[in-house]
A protein has these predicted regions:
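Active-site metal-binding loops of divalent metal-dependent hydrolases
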Residues: 1-3, 68-70, 97, 123-124, ...
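Zn-dependent metallo-beta-lactamase
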Residues: 1-60, 188-226, 230, 234
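Pre-active-site segment of Zn-dependent metallo-hydrolases
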Residues: 32-33, 44-91, 132, 209, ...
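Divalent metal-coordination and catalytic microenvironments
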Residues: 42, 67, 79, 96, ...
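Beta-strand-turn-beta hairpins that frame and shape the catalytic cleft
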Residues: 46-50, 59-63, 172, 176-191, ...
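Active-site metal-binding motif and surrounding structural segment of the metallo-beta-lactamase
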Residues: 73-120, 125-126, 260-270
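Cap/insert and terminal regions of metallo-dependent hydrolase folds
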Residues: 99-102, 117, 215-327
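Metallo-beta-lactamase
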Residues: 125-228, 323-333
Length: 334
């Protein structure tokens, strides 16, 4: 799921676009859904040991769903187009507790016939408000309900610190031991947990407040401490870093991924970079691009909340690195 769709984009070695026809007929509606939200199905495997059962299920593949979109059924509809069976997923991971990343979760849980791990930072369950710049208007955000999610089959796992996700479970991540991302039998993904803020220009979400459940008072909550990303290590190529919104800042996110893994080479950065919304977000576009050029990933795939202005500047500055995201696209890094 992404904010953008283009049915005419060509496929490439890296990007496989959604099908338009089957058996010499154009596919009937609905078309792929685009919305102001994000969701990614992530499959990680071991090339030298990948084996498949007769039904196509992988013996040795780690499949997770990262975020769930902003509408009730958008991700479900797109999954049907792509032939995705949600029962193949071993974990759902939330990048943070904003509704454009979790609203589709209940519909997804209904389609999973087993208890499923839901991994997130504990602050994802905060009750949050937005106070608008005029100082008068405010709006309460939709929030996650732990008990309702448990009734729907979610096994809630809250983690503040980095963790490794495999088919079998969740484990603490020892810093700078990048061999733990992949062992001889089990492909793993790194979830960063809370991301330290080191840049001066990535300022979080200044309009956000959290509700004190005892007093009802609103407390400034600009950092979005629950914001986290997913990291994979592609052998001989470097890190693939996947962000939901990058409220922590996409540069802070990349720096932390490199620190956690001890790997400096970045192969791809994909997801929301949160450089739209005017003001401080657009002020961060130029320093962000300057730093991205220094980091020098092979691919940049801005999605969701990156925004047109920032995406256009990326195309201008590093056209050879840019890949266009479009909902229902499959990106393959191997």
């Amino acid at each position: 799921m992404d904010n953008y769709t283009d049915r005419l984009l060509p496929s490439s070695l890296i990007a496989t676009r959604p099908p338009m026809m089957k058996n010499e007929q154009f596919l009937p509606p609905p078309p792929p859904v685009a919305e102001h939200g994000f969701s990614a199905l992530i499959r990680v495997g071991l090339n030298d040991t990948m084996a498949y059962q007769n039904n196509g299920e992988s013996f040795n593949e780690n499949i997770i769903l990262f975020d769930c979109g902003t509408s009730e059924n958008g991700v479900v509809s797109n999954a049907e187009i792509l032939g995705i069976n949600f029962n193949s997923i071993n974990s759902v991971i939330l990048s943070h507790g904003h509704f454009d990343h979790f609203t589709g979760l209940p519909s997804i849980l209904k389609r999973i016939d087993k208890p499923i791990r839901l991994i997130c930072h504990p602050d994802a369950f905060l009750r949050r408000w937005v106070l608008f710049p005029n100082g008068k208007d405010k709006a309460r955000m939709p929030f996650l309900d732990k008990e309702e999610l448990r009734r729907q089959g979610a096994i809630i796992v809250t983690k503040k610190n980095p963790s490794l996700i495999s088919q079998d479970g969740v484990e603490e991540y020892p810093y700078q031991l990048h061999d733990n991302l992949v062992d001889n039998s089990t492909p793993k993904l790194l979830v960063t947990g809370r991301i330290p803020r080191t840049t001066t220009y990535e300022k979080g979400f200044p309009l956000q407040y959290k509700e004190d459940l005892n007093t009802g008072n609103l407390i400034p909550d600009p950092l979005v401490n629950d914001d986290q990303a997913i990291v994979a290590n592609i052998k001989n190529k470097g890190l693939v870093i996947i962000s939901g919104c990058a409220h922590a800042g996409i540069i802070n996110t990349i720096r932390y991924a490199k620190l956690l893994t001890g790997i400096n080479k970045v192969y791809a950065v994909i997801g929301g970079f949160h450089l739209t919304g005017g003001g401080i977000y657009e002020d961060a576009i130029e320093p962000t691009i300057t730093e991205l050029k220094k980091i020098d990933p092979r691919y940049l795939i801005p999605c969701h909340c990156t925004g047109w202005k920032a995406t256009n500047r990326i195309i201008q500055e590093v056209p050879e690195k840019f890949l266009q995201s479009s909902t229902c696209t499959t990106f393959t890094f191997d």
